[in-house]
Structures are given as C-alpha cells and as structure tokens.
C-alpha cells in the first residue's frame, strides 16, 4: 500500500470532518481492522523470509536449483534434530527409517558449540496464528469500546447536562473509594483487636508471677530478725533494700489489680503478729515492743509501693497514712502496763487497720479509671478526619472557581469566619459550639474534656482517701480512750516511754523512705501534677494526727508549721529535684523493661 501525499491526507481529513459521527466511527473501525490485518501479513512474510535465509545458509552450493524446496525442509529437519544430509530425499516420507542405509549415529556424543548455535532457532522469528488475538489489537478494541460508550453517554446532550452527569459520576467514584477505604480500615481494626486479645493474658500472668516475690522475702526476713533493742539499727536498712526492690518491680508492672492482690499478702494479720511475738511473759515488756513494731512498721512502708501507678493524690495520701500508722502504734503501746493488755490492744489495732486497708483497696478498685473521650472516626470518609475535610474543601474551592470564571460577578453572601473563644485561632478542621454559645476549636474542646474527666477521677480518689483517714482517726481515738481507762504504774510507764523515744527516733529516720521509694515509681508525666496537688487544701492535716511531733510537713502545705518556709517556686523546684531517681535505679528500671 503506497503512502499518501500530504495534499491527499489533508483532503481526506477534511472529508472525515464533514462526515457524520456514525460514519466517521465506522470508517475508523474499518481502518483499524485493515491495519491490523496488514500488520499480521507483514509479520508472516518476515518470518517466511527469515526461514528462507536460514535455509540458504544450510543448503550446499552444488544444488542451487533446489533452494526453495529443500531449504525450508532442511530447516525443519534441523529443528527436529536430524543429522543426515539434506540432499538425500529417499527416506524423507517414511518416519522411523532415517538410519537404515547410513552408518549408526552416536547419540551420546556431545554436539559442538557451532552446531548447537546453528540448531537453535533465531529469536527474531515470531510465529503467529490467525486465531490468536495479539495484545495491541485487544487493547485497541478495549479503547474502542470505552470510547464508543463515552460517546453514546454524551450523545444528544447539552453542556449543562454533561457537567451534571460528570458531577454525578464523580460522586459515585468518591463513594466507591470511601467504601473501599472503610472496608480496609475495618479489616485493620479487626486484626488489631485479635492481637490485643492474644497479648493481654501473657501480661497478666507475668504480673502475677513477678509481684508477690518481694512480699514473701520481706516476711521471711522479718520473722528471722532477732528481737532485741540493739537490732533496731539493722532492721530499717533491710526494710529499705526490700522496699527498693518492691518499688522497682512494681514500676515495671502496669496492671493495678495485681499490685493490690500482692499487697494483701504483705499486710500481717493478728495471727502472724501473735506467732512472731510468742507467749506473753511478765519479764518481756521491753522485748515484745521492738519485735512488734518492725512488723507493723513494715506494713505501711510496703503499702507505699501500691499507688505508684495511680494519680499523685493517692500517692500523697498513702504517704500520710504511712506516717500516721507508726505513730499510732507507739502512742498506744506507751501507757500499757501489762503484757496481756498490750497484746489485746495490738491485736485489735492490727485487725482494725487490716480491715480498714482491705476496705480502702476495695473502694479504690471500684473507682473506674478516667475514660478517654469518645474518639472521632479516623478513616477517610469520616467528616471528623482533618485530611478528608481538607481535600473536600479544596475540591469545592476549585469547583467554585471553575464555575465562577464564565459568570458575571454577582453579589455573594459574606459570612464572618469563626474564631475560637479560648485560643483565638481562626482555623480548625472541626468547629464545636457549646451550650452557652461559645465556639471552640477541636483541640480546645478535646483538652477541656480530658481535663474534666481527670479532675473527676482525682476528686473521687481524694474523697476515698480522706474517708479512710477519718476512719483511721476514729479507731485511734477509740484506742486512746480505752488506754486512758486502764490503770497505769510508774515503772512500766517509764520503761515504755524510753522505748517510745527510741521508736520515734527510728521512725523519723525511716519517714523519708516511703516518700523516696514512692517517687521512684511515679512516672515523669505525673511529677508536674504532684507539685500542684501538694498545695491542695485537703492535705492540711494537723500535726497531732501524725503522731510525730518532730516532723514538720511544711513542704506539703504552707499553712502547716510555725515558721515561714521558702518561696513557692523554690519549694517546687526542691520537690522536683528530690523526685529524680538515682542513676543506678533508673538504669535497672530501663534494663527490666
């Protein structure tokens, strides 16, 4: 087919532009079909010519007249692996009789590289059949079908109808994309829930295994210590080391109920106290008191490791309770003259405090943790997702600009932009309006909800601890009244008062330990809140309730204490510096994580 000249091509294009659309499409389809057939014929001719060229290389020069017939046949025989000469055509039509008149062929011998190169067909030869549909033709047919469908869709419609149809199709496409993304997100959330369900039992088992170990170690160490006044200097040191280990292990735990379950093992009951003291005798007034006090002192100190994972208000109140309990033991034991009365009072006091502690644990477990606010749906089709809103807004802006280009400038309604009443910002992906009419941005509204939930949980914890302190104060007053009614003797009072001074001295030495061990377990995020809670009015407990006349808690509240303390900033800085754990403990905590 000869090529057209430029004039003929231009004339043909003009004729096609004047023809109707249907005839133009038919002509285009016919032309594509003809071009496809021509391409197939050219490929077949090319393959045939290459076969003939290869046959010319194989045929001997003595037979120039038999090139056409024997060349093609020789090439086909080479492809089949036949090694006999091509000039002998006597046995060509009889299969299986190739080597009757010739010498036998060694099939095991290796063929040389030149022969192997001659036997392999050329990669340029492409064999096509008429039944196969090549990829260019199939792709062109698909394009023709799509083009025909698009032309039929817009046929006989105006510009406005076409724009409306395009907008409708665009909305359908957006809905399909949103549905696809939603299905993907649902699948991801299901996989995450399955992983969480599989991981939680492992963490709980690890917590139940690790946590009770310091309790048993502490009780065994206390039961083996000698019961003499000179051993008082050794026992607090052992208690400190045990307390440090318990705080470090509890800091790695994140489940609060297991810590409280292990705390029940640490708290001694009256039977354990009676078994440690042994049978009461009149001559053992001095020895029973120091043997009883370390056991009772160990109870509040070990309990200070419980609220390490709680909020700071619970930590401060538990620390105050740990200060109260050693003082109450000393003051009750001072006016008791006989060992039987002292044993009964100690048993009743330990039983009452154990019941009070169990009730406090039950109350704290019933208080639910602060629930986070309901999260917004973070997937693409959600209107609460900022990225989705950005894209929709950008699309609307572009569409409005395109629509307004061809129209006259009309008077548009002007709306004042919103401004956040709290942070004064004028841009947010989602505006919120409160009941009182204030308009807030999304970030301010979320922070306000979190603060309200956290404050509510803190108030619940404070009320629970204040109620527990009041009950403990009532128990202490009742025991004081019972002790005042019993007769007293001068020698017993003097001996017990001397023992009371010794115990107060050791209590003052041990008093900072629960606070320091508590500070090691408190996370960094809660330390800033701890200094704020230290100024709360609920902490203004009189010094007489603590049972420690020599201890001043002016670092907790400025109203407590006779002299004027340092400034607020200095006290907060000193308080924060005291809470920084040593390097060795921080390294051990990071190593256990």
Curated annotation (Swiss-Prot):
<keyword id="KW-0805">Transcription regulation</keyword>
<dbReference type="GO" id="GO:0016607">
    <property type="term" value="C:nuclear speck"/>
</dbReference>
<dbReference type="InterPro" id="IPR000679">
    <property type="entry name" value="Znf_GATA"/>
</dbReference>
<feature type="modified residue" description="Phosphothreonine">
    <location>
        <position position="120"/>
    </location>
</feature>
<feature type="modified residue" description="Phosphoserine">
    <location>
        <position position="122"/>
    </location>
</feature>
<feature type="cross-link" description="Glycyl lysine isopeptide (Lys-Gly) (interchain with G-Cter in SUMO2)">
    <location>
        <position position="281"/>
    </location>
</feature>
<feature type="cross-link" description="Glycyl lysine isopeptide (Lys-Gly) (interchain with G-Cter in SUMO2)">
    <location>
        <position position="353"/>
    </location>
</feature>
<keyword id="KW-0863">Zinc-finger</keyword>
<dbReference type="Pfam" id="PF16563">
    <property type="entry name" value="P66_CC"/>
</dbReference>
<dbReference type="GO" id="GO:0045892">
    <property type="term" value="P:negative regulation of DNA-templated transcription"/>
</dbReference>
<keyword id="KW-0678">Repressor</keyword>
<feature type="cross-link" description="Glycyl lysine isopeptide (Lys-Gly) (interchain with G-Cter in SUMO2)">
    <location>
        <position position="467"/>
    </location>
</feature>
<dbReference type="InterPro" id="IPR040386">
    <property type="entry name" value="P66"/>
</dbReference>
<feature type="coiled-coil region">
    <location>
        <begin position="449"/>
        <end position="482"/>
    </location>
</feature>
<feature type="cross-link" description="Glycyl lysine isopeptide (Lys-Gly) (interchain with G-Cter in SUMO2)">
    <location>
        <position position="498"/>
    </location>
</feature>
<feature type="modified residue" description="Phosphoserine">
    <location>
        <position position="338"/>
    </location>
</feature>
<dbReference type="GO" id="GO:0000781">
    <property type="term" value="C:chromosome, telomeric region"/>
</dbReference>
<keyword id="KW-0804">Transcription</keyword>
<feature type="modified residue" description="Phosphoserine">
    <location>
        <position position="17"/>
    </location>
</feature>
<keyword id="KW-0597">Phosphoprotein</keyword>
<keyword id="KW-0175">Coiled coil</keyword>
<dbReference type="GO" id="GO:0006338">
    <property type="term" value="P:chromatin remodeling"/>
</dbReference>
<keyword id="KW-0158">Chromosome</keyword>
<dbReference type="GO" id="GO:0005654">
    <property type="term" value="C:nucleoplasm"/>
</dbReference>
<feature type="region of interest" description="CR1; interaction with MBD2 and MBD3">
    <location>
        <begin position="165"/>
        <end position="195"/>
    </location>
</feature>
<dbReference type="InterPro" id="IPR013088">
    <property type="entry name" value="Znf_NHR/GATA"/>
</dbReference>
<feature type="modified residue" description="Phosphoserine">
    <location>
        <position position="129"/>
    </location>
</feature>
<feature type="zinc finger region" description="GATA-type">
    <location>
        <begin position="414"/>
        <end position="467"/>
    </location>
</feature>
<feature type="region of interest" description="CR2; histone tail-binding">
    <location>
        <begin position="340"/>
        <end position="480"/>
    </location>
</feature>
<feature type="cross-link" description="Glycyl lysine isopeptide (Lys-Gly) (interchain with G-Cter in SUMO2)">
    <location>
        <position position="199"/>
    </location>
</feature>
<keyword id="KW-0862">Zinc</keyword>
<feature type="cross-link" description="Glycyl lysine isopeptide (Lys-Gly) (interchain with G-Cter in SUMO2)">
    <location>
        <position position="147"/>
    </location>
</feature>
<keyword id="KW-1017">Isopeptide bond</keyword>
<keyword id="KW-0991">Intellectual disability</keyword>
<feature type="compositionally biased region" description="Basic and acidic residues">
    <location>
        <begin position="74"/>
        <end position="100"/>
    </location>
</feature>
<dbReference type="GO" id="GO:0045893">
    <property type="term" value="P:positive regulation of DNA-templated transcription"/>
</dbReference>
<dbReference type="GO" id="GO:0000785">
    <property type="term" value="C:chromatin"/>
</dbReference>
<feature type="region of interest" description="Disordered">
    <location>
        <begin position="213"/>
        <end position="235"/>
    </location>
</feature>
<comment type="subunit">
    <text>Homooligomer. Component of the nucleosome remodeling and deacetylase (NuRD) repressor complex, composed of core proteins MTA1, MTA2, MTA3, RBBP4, RBBP7, HDAC1, HDAC2, MBD2, MBD3, and peripherally associated proteins CDK2AP1, CDK2AP2, GATAD2A, GATAD2B, CHD3, CHD4 and CHD5. The exact stoichiometry of the NuRD complex is unknown, and some subunits such as MBD2 and MBD3, GATAD2A and GATAD2B, and CHD3, CHD4 and CHD5 define mutually exclusive NuRD complexes. Interacts with MBD2; this is required for the enhancement of MBD2-mediated repression and for targeting to the chromatin. Interacts with MBD3.</text>
</comment>
<keyword id="KW-0539">Nucleus</keyword>
<feature type="cross-link" description="Glycyl lysine isopeptide (Lys-Gly) (interchain with G-Cter in SUMO2)">
    <location>
        <position position="33"/>
    </location>
</feature>
<feature type="compositionally biased region" description="Basic and acidic residues">
    <location>
        <begin position="108"/>
        <end position="118"/>
    </location>
</feature>
């Amino acid at each position: 087919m000869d090529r057209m000249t430029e004039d003929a091509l231009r004339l043909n294009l003009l004729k096609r532009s004047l023809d109707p659309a249907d005839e133009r499409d038919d002509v285009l389809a016919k032309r594509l079909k003809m071009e496809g057939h021509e391409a197939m014929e050219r490929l077949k001719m090319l393959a045939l010519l290459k076969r003939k060229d290869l046959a010319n290389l194989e045929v001997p020069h003595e037979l120039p007249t038999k090139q056409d017939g024997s060349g093609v046949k020789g090439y086909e025989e080479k492809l089949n692996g036949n090694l006999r000469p091509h000039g002998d055509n006597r046995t060509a039509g009889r299969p299986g009789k190739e080597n009757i008149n010739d010498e036998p062929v060694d099939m095991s011998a290796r063929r040389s590289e030149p022969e192997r190169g001659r036997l392999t067909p050329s990669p340029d030869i492409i064999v096509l059949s008429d039944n196969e549909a090549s990829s260019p033709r199939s792709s062109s047919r698909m394009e023709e079908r799509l083009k025909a469908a698009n032309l039929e869709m817009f046929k006989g419609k105006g510009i406005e109808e076409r724009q409306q149809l395009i907008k409708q199709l665009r909305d359908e496409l957006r809905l399909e994309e949103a549905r696809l993304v939603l299905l993907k997100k649902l699948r991801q959330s299901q996989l995450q829930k399955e992983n969480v369900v599989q991981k939680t039992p492992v963490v709980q088992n690890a917590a139940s295994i690790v946590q009770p170990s310091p309790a048993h170690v502490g009780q065994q160490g206390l039961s083996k210590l000698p019961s003499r006044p000179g051993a008082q200097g050794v026992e607090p040191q052992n208690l400190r080391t045990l307390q440090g280990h318990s705080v470090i292990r509890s800091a790695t735990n994140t489940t609060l109920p297991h810590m409280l379950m292990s705390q029940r093992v640490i708290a001694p009951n009256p039977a354990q106290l009676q078994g440690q003291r042994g049978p009461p005798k009149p001559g053992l007034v001095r020895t029973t008191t120091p043997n009883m006090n370390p056991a009772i002192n160990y109870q509040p100190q070990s309990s200070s490791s419980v609220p390490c994972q709680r909020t700071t208000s619970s930590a401060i109140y538990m620390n105050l309770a740990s200060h109260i309990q050693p003082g109450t033991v000393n003051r009750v034991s001072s006016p008791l003259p006989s060992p039987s009365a002292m044993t009964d009072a100690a048993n009743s006091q330990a039983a009452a405090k154990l019941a009070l502690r169990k009730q406090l644990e039950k109350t704290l477990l019933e208080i639910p943790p602060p629930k986070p606010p309901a999260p917004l749906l973070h997937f693409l089709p959600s209107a609460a997702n900022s990225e989705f809103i950005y894209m929709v807004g950008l699309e609307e802006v572009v569409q409005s600009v395109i629509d307004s280009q061809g129209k006259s400038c009309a008077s548009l309604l002007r709306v004042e932009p919103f401004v956040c009443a709290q942070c004064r910002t004028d841009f947010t992906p989602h505006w919120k309006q409160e009941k009182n009419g204030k308009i807030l941005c999304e970030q301010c509204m979320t922070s306000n909800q979190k603060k309200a939930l956290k404050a509510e949980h803190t108030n619940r914890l404070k009320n629970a601890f204040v109620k527990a302190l009041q009950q403990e104060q009532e128990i202490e007053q009742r025991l004081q009244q019972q002790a005042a009614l019993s007769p007293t003797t001068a020698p017993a009072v003097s001996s017990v008062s001397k023992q009371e001074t010794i115990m107060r001295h050791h209590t003052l030495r041990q008093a900072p330990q629960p606070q320091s061990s508590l500070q090691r377990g408190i996370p960094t995020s809660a330390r800033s809140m701890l200094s704020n809670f230290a100024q709360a009015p609920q902490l203004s407990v009189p010094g007489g309730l603590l049972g420690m006349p020599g201890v001043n808690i002016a670092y907790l509240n400025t109203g407590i204490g006779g002299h004027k303390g340092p400034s607020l900033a200095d006290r907060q800085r000193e308080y924060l510096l005291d809470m920084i754990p040593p390097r060795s403990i921080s390294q051990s905590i990071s190593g256990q994580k």
